[in-house]
């Protein structure tokens, strides 16, 4: 059973988006969810209870299930994430260097032709999706 696929197919019906999913050492699952307006503790409990029952029905073997919000430094995984958070500060690490560097911090400035546009100190850097290793929002206080 592909647990990621199970999560991706089930969460939208509950009104949530799958932000990320991790398998932890010892047979645990860590699930990060979101929805417009943010996530509450009650949301996490509801999703956890739902998946506990679903995993039992689907015979998914696991030791521990953690459900939480993605936090202020939310990972950016899908093209829609980069569009949704346009204008916000983000950190992006690339697989291969662009202009002799692999780590960038700047404002998300849109998505075009398979690349993320990042405003780094007034200069637009285009980063192809295929070259993104990790991307996260950078909290501003």
From Swiss-Prot:
Gene3D superfamilies: Ribosome maturation factor RimP, C-terminal domain (2.30.30.180), RimP-like superfamily, N-terminal (3.30.300.70)
Localization, UniProt: Cytoplasm
InterPro entries from the UniProt entry: Ribosome_maturation_RimP, RimP_C, RimP_C_sf, RimP_N, RimP_N_sf
A Pfam family reported for this protein in Swiss-Prot or TrEMBL: RimP_N
Keyword Disulfide bond on entry: no
A GO cellular component entry from the record: cytosol
Protein's GO biological process: ribosomal small subunit assembly; translation
Predominant cellular place of this UniProt entry's protein: cytoplasm
Keyword set, alphabetical order: Cytoplasm, Ribosome biogenesis
UniProt key word DNA damage: no
Role according to the record: Required for maturation of 30S ribosomal subunits.
Family: Belongs to the RimP family.
NCBIfam families according to UniProt: PRK00092.2-1 (NF000929)
PANTHER family: RIBOSOME MATURATION FACTOR RIMP
Protein name in UniProt: Ribosome maturation factor RimP
């Amino acid at each position: 059973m592909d647990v990621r696929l199970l999560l991706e197919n089930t969460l939208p019906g509950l009104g949530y988006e799958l932000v990320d999913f991790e398998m932890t050492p010892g047979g645990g699952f860590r699930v990060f969810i979101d929805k417009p307006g943010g996530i509450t503790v009650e949301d996490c409990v509801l999703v956890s209870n739902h998946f506990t029952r679903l995993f039992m029905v689907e015979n998914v073997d696991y030791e521990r299930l953690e459900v939480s919000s993605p936090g202020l430094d939310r990972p950016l995984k899908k093209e829609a994430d980069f569009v949704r958070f346009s204008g916000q500060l983000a950190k992006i690490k690339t697989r291969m260097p662009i202009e002799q560097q692999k780590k960038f911090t700047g404002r998300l400035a849109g998505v075009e032709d398979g690349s993320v546009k990042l405003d780094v100190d007034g200069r637009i850097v285009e980063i192809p999706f295929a070259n993104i290793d990790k991307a996260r929002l950078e909290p501003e206080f």
